[in-house]
């Protein structure tokens, strides 16, 4: 298998952004897997060549990356990640040519770091995460698996973010706080103190608006 061959899973808007990142990182994109009704169509310059049921036939030909977005719920991204793993496939870890990831930081498999993002020394980012455009993951911060840190967000030093968390665009996490699992933080929020109850938070300071059942 050529380690630079890549199959994208999910053909929406996030897929277009990941295509640009993958091209900048030197990947050879073989095609996109999407819904049955999309087969034969194109996403930018790349054909939709099948559905996620076709993952097993590409395991020996390419790595995979999940290109379904995550705003309200990570369930589809988690399902795709697990489907690749169950098929014996490998998930690529992709860093845009314009991003900076410290050699003292770690990234989990299936994670993509988008253009102009920074992951600083000592930071740990889990599996199947989106570190979106212009994000800053500061020193010694920990991001759990299956998270989306959205555009322009600042995760300050020593923060800990649990699994399956979405942090909306241009939000700020104050130094050293903890965000629990299965939490959504609305765009433009300032999380000044640690939060743990599952639900939707927003505002400055960020407060719980909707508690998950």
Which residues does each PLM region occupy?
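Cofactor-binding loop segments of dinucleotide-utilizing enzymes, especially the Rossmann-like FAD-
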Residues: 11, 34-35, 69, 96, ...
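Hydrophobic, well-ordered beta-alpha structural blocks that scaffold small-molecule cofactor pockets
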Residues: 1-43, 49-52, 56-57
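Short helix-capping segments at alpha-helix termini
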Residues: 26, 85-89, 193
């Amino acid at each position: 298998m050529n380690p630079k061959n890549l199959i994208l899973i999910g053909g929406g808007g996030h897929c277009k952004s990941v295509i640009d990142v993958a091209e900048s990182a030197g990947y050879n994109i073989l095609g996109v897997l999407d819904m049955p009704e999309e087969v034969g169509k194109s996403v930018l310059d790349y054909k939709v060549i099948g559905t996620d049921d076709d993952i097993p036939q590409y395991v020996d030909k390419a790595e995979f990356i999940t290109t379904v977005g995550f705003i309200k719920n990570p369930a589809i991204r988690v399902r795709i990640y697990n489907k690749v793993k169950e098929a014996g496939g490998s998930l690529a870890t992709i860093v845009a040519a314009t991003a900076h990831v410290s050699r003292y930081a770690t990234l989990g498999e299936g994670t993509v770091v988008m253009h102009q993002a920074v992951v600083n020394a000592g930071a740990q980012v889990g599996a199947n995460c989106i570190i979106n455009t212009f994000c800053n993951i500061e020193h010694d911060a920990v991001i759990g698996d299956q998270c989306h840190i959205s555009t322009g967000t600042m995760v300050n030093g020593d923060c800990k973010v649990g699994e399956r968390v979405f942090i909306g665009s241009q939000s700020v996490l104050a130094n050293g706080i903890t965000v629990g699992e299965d939490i959504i933080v609305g765009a433009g929020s300032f999380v000044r103190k640690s939060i743990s109850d599952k639900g939707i938070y927003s505002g400055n300071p960020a407060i719980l608006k909707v508690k998950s059942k």
